[in-house]
Amino acid sequence: MSGRTLLSVFVGTLLLGVAAAADARDHRACSTARAAGEWGYTKTGTLVLPTGATLFASVGRFSLGPDGVMEGENNGSVGGHVSKDVLKGTFEVNPDCTGAMTIEVYDESGNLLRTIAMALVFVDDGRAARGIVTSLVLPNGASLPSIITADAKRLHRDYGNRGWSR
């Protein structure tokens, strides 16, 4: 092979390697640590109470820590009754960008109101997440049927700016 041909093969191979590395970076696996940061979200849906179905909505902000700890606060409405709630929980994110979260919801006095389990999927390279409530349990142990979905967007990747939470 001539020097020119060898140089062409070398440059071509190098360019293919760089392109493959760039492609690999674009498809990084998701993880609990990569999800860490500050998030804003909305949840909407329906709760099935013993007295009948009622609408549910909330908007809030939460922190996800690289250690799988979640905390935040929200303003929620159940059937038009608005309250401010404190959120504490845990989460995990799988390499395929699915995940799970368990959230304990407290009133401002520290009384447990409910415990929620959610199934999650992180999208848009970890800049957003979608979720659905898979379980809602009251403090007395009673399960409450619900159809509630969530939409969250990352505010920023910084973790530790939690002065707004309790």
Model-found features: residue ranges?
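N-terminal secretory signal peptides that target proteins for export/translocation
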Residues: 1-4
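Bacterial N-terminal signal peptides
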Residues: 8-17
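Mature soluble binding/inhibitory domains
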Residues: 22-166
